[in-house]
Amino acid sequence: MKGLLDLFKQFTPDEHFDAIKIGLASPEKIRSWSFGEVKKPETINYRTFKPERDGLFCAKIFGPIKDYECLCGKYKRLKHRGVICEKCGVEVTQTKVRRDRMGHIDLAAPCAHIWFLKSLPSRLGLVLDMTLRDIERVLYFEAYVVTDPGMTPLKKFSIMTEDDYDTKKREFGDEFVALMGAEGIKQLLQEMDLDTEIDKLRNDMTGSELKVKKNSKRLKVMEAFKKSGIKPNWMVMDVLPVLPPDLRPLVPLDGGRFATSDLNDLYRRVINRNNRLARLLELKAPEIIVRNEKRMLQEAVDSLLDNGRRGKAMTGANKRALKSLADMIKGKSGRFRQNLLGKRVDYSGRSVITVGPYLKLHQCGLPKLMALELFKPFIFSRLEAMGIASTIKQAKKEVESGTPVVWDILEEVIKEHPVMLNRAPTLHRLGIQAFEPVLIEGKAIQLHPLVCSAFNADFDGDQMAVHVPLSIEAQMEARTLMLASNNVLFPASGEPSIVPSQDVVLGLYYATRERTNGLGEGMIFSDVVEVQRALDNKVVEITARISVRLTEWLRPEDGSDNFEPHTSLIHTTVGRALLSEILPKGLPFSVMNKALKKKEISRLINTAFRKCGLKATVVFADKLLQSGFRLATRAGISIAIDDMLVPKQKQMLIERAENEVKEIEQQYVSGLVTAGERYNKVVDIWGKTGDEVGKVMMSQLSKQKVIDRNGKEVDQESFNSIYMMADSGARGSAAQIRQLAGMRGLMAKPDGSIIETPITANFREGLNVLQYFISTHGARKGLADTALKTANSGYLTRRLVDVTQDLVVIEDDCGTDNGMAMRALVEGGEVIESLRDRILGRVTAIDVTHPETQEVLVLAGKMLDEDTMEVLEAAGVDEVKVRTSLTCDTRFGICAKCYGRDLGRGGLVNQGEAVGVIAAQSIGEPGTQLTMRTFHIGGAASRAAVASSVDAKSDGIIGFNSTMRYVTNAKGELVVISRSGEIIITDPHGRERERHKVPYGAILNVKPDQTLKAGTILGNWDPLTRPIITEFAGHTRFENVEEGVTVAKQVDEVTGLSTLVVIDPKRRGSAKVVRPQVKLLDVNGQEVKIPGTDHSVTIGFPIGALIQVRDGQDVMPGEVLARIPVEGQKTRDITGGLPRVAELFEARTPKDKGILAEVTGTVSFGKETKGKVRLQITDPEGKVYEELVPKEKNIVVHEGQVVNKGESIIDGPADPQDILRLLGVEELARYIVDEVQDVYRLQGVKINDKHIEVIVRQMLRRVQITNPGDSHYILGEQVERSELFGTNDKLRAQDKLPATYSDVLLGITKASLSTDSFISAASFQETTRVLTEAAIMGKRDELRGLKENVIVGRLIPAGTGMAYHQARKAKDELDDNERRLIAMQEAQEALAAVDADMADSAGNAAE
């Protein structure tokens, strides 16, 4: 029977397609889709439930209601398939054709498509060169448009009101034609000749910038119409397609009411108005009535296409705006994001998770009931195969009765069939992993404790979902790629993800600690077995120091896998000796012969992975886990209130602080300090005190006095439970212990400002009511913050994924030798990130040579692994040029060499790896750990910023960077006068050890090439004021320094001294803008000139400066002329955390941005205009570049200074666009990478640089055409980089002029929307705008990215899917060739047959 039914299945050939095209439908096209015209607004007959004929659900147009049965019931059954009933006109076929048969409505008057009218920029407006307002007035019958001026002076395209029209009609009669409504617009569009318009525009690309911009926009649209073969008048519709009825269903509810899709209401409105208009036209009704009806029809069509886009949205009976066709596809619940990108999955279940401590890493516990349900089909087929059940129905019964044989079969079916576990939210690829199921009783899924950190799961009620991979291919991929034991590293950083936490760490830590004078200290054992026996018999304790003979299995010199035993007597402790049993072969015991804190365990697992491989590591991790649980139980570590030791010095410290605060209050009352300073100082004092109490408490907790074997009292590390928990990294931190036993310290108000009275109590002593109340602020803000953070972080991840989703490794090597020079990241003299961390797992771009002997250490094109890094570190290499994804030349993808190591697997990245998505996940996943706040500099936050000196961390030789300039003052001290000076300390070989920024005005204590010892102070400065220093000697002459106009005298109330302060010009009496400044005169009274120029030395005083010299005083170089108190500077908010990362990736221009020098040259100041300073830079050719700078900006250059292109001339945060324009791609990448890393580093999150580089590559993927050459591009057009390179290659091959371009930096949202794939862009944001644009251009989506392929339901072109697509392409080419061959053969055979026939007939004739 089944075979018979298969015969009747309608065969649909497998459709292979390589691209999807979108366009505007012509009226003919719409009619060709249609199966009939919908003439009536009726839907279904409410009594018979049958669809009305010619209505919106008409069976004649759209197909039958029941399978193979016409409406009147004359033809039933399969045998009449394809018959059209003569009575009711319905074709006898399957009912599912009602999902794809369309109808149409012939509109009685043309209607404009609202998308092309209202979606900005208005396409209709661009084509017609009319304003949107004018077009709307014409369309909605408020004005006439002239379509044919005839012999009259009227202009075509001009607009006239009704009164104008009447006057002109009287004046000119029928000489001209002016129309109203969509007819007029359609007429104009029809008469438009694209070719002439394009030529006109191409020749008219001169004149003002605005005109050129406007013309190039129009040109782009016109070219698009011409290229795609779409006629502009199709933007006005004569025929409206009708959606198939099953896609806008009408469902009868009980009680005789109906639930209907909003579209039916909208269609009914259109049909009603259309029919009424047709009737009015037939009756030749008065113009005004017809006009109103036409307007209403246009509005109805607008609402159907995009409700609410113009005017008020149409509403249904319940005052709710109706969902139009546009609403169906856009937004989170639209077609794209709800149904195409997010589908529900069959064969899945979910349940609560619990711990499975006895599981192996690749296993999970699956409840029997769940497994039975999930694997049902497999069980049915086994039952049938074994002959226990003959039909599926019988098998069902068997399973439901739960006979023992069913459970046996379940065991069998489940064996070696991996299942996938997922925990929402799935923030990175480790959120879904495959496990082998183990059947368990109960109803909770059991999860291996080591994978918790990857899933971010805990057992406080979390739920997880189970999915069953069905096909053999799916099972294979789950096993080889997704099995938990194959994913032991985080793809974000390459750190191990299977690191034990909490009690396991505590157990291992306790067992590997040493105790002075422990039971059995100093004993010597022959092997581990003996140690175990001694422990069991309580002769030794687990923390005692002993010596034991151990055998280590080490890898031989030649690196082969034949491990050699090395036996020796080792000093260690009992616990460590016992743990040595589980050490994998190839690791020396020294890696374990220390107290195992969490970091150490992580390092241990990492070392094991690099040295012993994956399998050994997984086994080792499992054993560590078992040991950790067992030892933690044995240790019996508990927590008690007496473990929280409050230091005795606490009271004294607090009293001291209170006295200091009193002193400052006194100073404030006497007017020595301002209110702001008082607040800052008080907060500072309490902050310091809190830290001191914390320090004292920790030192008390962490040490304890014990008697050693010789009877002496010694300090040993404490065995205090709370200290051990924090020290091992199991739970808690120093800050939390400080709140338990130190003092809670300062609290913040809800607005983020710090309350200046701290909580001096701790939790052990208990808080009073006021203290408790103060601390509730912070706690609640924390909860509110978390909720906001999650949403924001999710949105950032979504944007990142969208911008990188089509970046896949598609070839092994692009052959470029470009790269980026990497060196250790040093800030404030401290190495923040070593060279090793930055280049590990990268591929060298050029040979790396030994700094002294110049021998080649690493060849170009080699991946730097751990062993190579040791060689480089030994040689002291401090800079390596490595390949990076930014300089990769691969088109439409990236190559493996430029990407480097796949961090999640530890080898060179495979072809087909979706590195873009991995980068996005790696940056997005820790997003929830970042803060949401913006920090105010002030109070506790600023303490880090106030350094007043800098000292050397290592011995070496002093050098200065190229921009460092200094003068010697009267005392013989060196005073820094450059803004970006840095001191560099190098070792004797000339390798950089550290570099320190020194601010303007600092006094240097060292000279160039001086050799110094670590700890020497290099320079010091006053952190609270910014000085203004003269570089030249001379006699001062003040200009514009007038009291009450530009300066005010401030008299200090206490000391009675007076100083001049420069005041803000906004508050001055006079309207004239003058800038107070000082000039220097030489002995002859002439103005001192800057050497080599004829500019006088002029030093301006900024607002808020305290002038330190008198008029007419003699000054020496390096002397301070004025000081600006830092307090007077506006405290800049630092954007931190998540908003900062988003700001960087969106490439937003910061507010109050710094300005960089556009050219290299000499600085001078021109004459001032309206509150702005004219800053000029003269380049070596003598060209002058000008920048107008508002007065209140802080200019960091001075007259006569030579600046390099891209150097900062005005203080403030850098604008990434400027960095790209002036300094290039590499500097930009460096800036973004460093800034993003700063944010994550603050939270202690490790992310590899390459992920951020991948995102930057995608932000730079479009270029702007600066000269089109012989290409078809338009000046200023933005094009995909890969596409442009392809075009240029073709042009060069034909000896034509290639197009030139400049780099463009787009923010991630912009970049996602401007991709070449319209499907991907439409499913991201602004669906309407993207589709409108794509339709006009007749865009073709090549389906290159992952998203497009998911949407159209193909395998994604990444991973195993990439191989599939490549194979398919190859097969298609083969097939084509084969077809040609076969065709040729057939032709030859046919010819031969003809010849034979002719020979035959000739023979017959002869006979």
From Swiss-Prot:
<comment type="similarity">
    <text>Belongs to the RNA polymerase beta' chain family.</text>
</comment>
<dbReference type="GO" id="GO:0003899">
    <property type="term" value="F:DNA-directed RNA polymerase activity"/>
</dbReference>
<comment type="subunit">
    <text>The RNAP catalytic core consists of 2 alpha, 1 beta, 1 beta' and 1 omega subunit. When a sigma factor is associated with the core the holoenzyme is formed, which can initiate transcription.</text>
</comment>
<dbReference type="Pfam" id="PF04983">
    <property type="entry name" value="RNA_pol_Rpb1_3"/>
</dbReference>
<feature type="binding site">
    <location>
        <position position="70"/>
    </location>
    <ligand>
        <name>Zn(2+) 1</name>
    </ligand>
</feature>
<feature type="binding site">
    <location>
        <position position="458"/>
    </location>
    <ligand>
        <name>Mg(2+)</name>
    </ligand>
</feature>
<dbReference type="InterPro" id="IPR007081">
    <property type="entry name" value="RNA_pol_Rpb1_5"/>
</dbReference>
<feature type="binding site">
    <location>
        <position position="462"/>
    </location>
    <ligand>
        <name>Mg(2+)</name>
    </ligand>
</feature>
<dbReference type="InterPro" id="IPR007080">
    <property type="entry name" value="RNA_pol_Rpb1_1"/>
</dbReference>
<dbReference type="Pfam" id="PF00623">
    <property type="entry name" value="RNA_pol_Rpb1_2"/>
</dbReference>
<dbReference type="GO" id="GO:0006351">
    <property type="term" value="P:DNA-templated transcription"/>
</dbReference>
<dbReference type="InterPro" id="IPR012754">
    <property type="entry name" value="DNA-dir_RpoC_beta_prime_bact"/>
</dbReference>
<dbReference type="Pfam" id="PF04998">
    <property type="entry name" value="RNA_pol_Rpb1_5"/>
</dbReference>
<dbReference type="Pfam" id="PF05000">
    <property type="entry name" value="RNA_pol_Rpb1_4"/>
</dbReference>
<dbReference type="GO" id="GO:0000428">
    <property type="term" value="C:DNA-directed RNA polymerase complex"/>
</dbReference>
<dbReference type="InterPro" id="IPR045867">
    <property type="entry name" value="DNA-dir_RpoC_beta_prime"/>
</dbReference>
<keyword id="KW-0804">Transcription</keyword>
<feature type="binding site">
    <location>
        <position position="88"/>
    </location>
    <ligand>
        <name>Zn(2+) 1</name>
    </ligand>
</feature>
<dbReference type="Pfam" id="PF04997">
    <property type="entry name" value="RNA_pol_Rpb1_1"/>
</dbReference>
<keyword id="KW-0862">Zinc</keyword>
<keyword id="KW-0479">Metal-binding</keyword>
<dbReference type="GO" id="GO:0003677">
    <property type="term" value="F:DNA binding"/>
</dbReference>
<protein>
    <recommendedName>
        <fullName>DNA-directed RNA polymerase subunit beta'</fullName>
        <ecNumber>2.7.7.6</ecNumber>
    </recommendedName>
</protein>
<keyword id="KW-0808">Transferase</keyword>
<keyword id="KW-0548">Nucleotidyltransferase</keyword>
<dbReference type="InterPro" id="IPR007083">
    <property type="entry name" value="RNA_pol_Rpb1_4"/>
</dbReference>
<keyword id="KW-0240">DNA-directed RNA polymerase</keyword>
<feature type="binding site">
    <location>
        <position position="460"/>
    </location>
    <ligand>
        <name>Mg(2+)</name>
    </ligand>
</feature>
<feature type="binding site">
    <location>
        <position position="85"/>
    </location>
    <ligand>
        <name>Zn(2+) 1</name>
    </ligand>
</feature>
<dbReference type="InterPro" id="IPR000722">
    <property type="entry name" value="RNA_pol_asu"/>
</dbReference>
<feature type="binding site">
    <location>
        <position position="888"/>
    </location>
    <ligand>
        <name>Zn(2+) 2</name>
    </ligand>
</feature>
<feature type="binding site">
    <location>
        <position position="72"/>
    </location>
    <ligand>
        <name>Zn(2+) 1</name>
    </ligand>
</feature>
<dbReference type="InterPro" id="IPR044893">
    <property type="entry name" value="RNA_pol_Rpb1_clamp_domain"/>
</dbReference>
<dbReference type="InterPro" id="IPR042102">
    <property type="entry name" value="RNA_pol_Rpb1_3_sf"/>
</dbReference>
<dbReference type="InterPro" id="IPR038120">
    <property type="entry name" value="Rpb1_funnel_sf"/>
</dbReference>
<dbReference type="InterPro" id="IPR007066">
    <property type="entry name" value="RNA_pol_Rpb1_3"/>
</dbReference>
<feature type="binding site">
    <location>
        <position position="898"/>
    </location>
    <ligand>
        <name>Zn(2+) 2</name>
    </ligand>
</feature>
<dbReference type="GO" id="GO:0000287">
    <property type="term" value="F:magnesium ion binding"/>
</dbReference>
<feature type="binding site">
    <location>
        <position position="814"/>
    </location>
    <ligand>
        <name>Zn(2+) 2</name>
    </ligand>
</feature>
<feature type="binding site">
    <location>
        <position position="895"/>
    </location>
    <ligand>
        <name>Zn(2+) 2</name>
    </ligand>
</feature>
<comment type="function">
    <text>DNA-dependent RNA polymerase catalyzes the transcription of DNA into RNA using the four ribonucleoside triphosphates as substrates.</text>
</comment>
<dbReference type="InterPro" id="IPR006592">
    <property type="entry name" value="RNA_pol_N"/>
</dbReference>
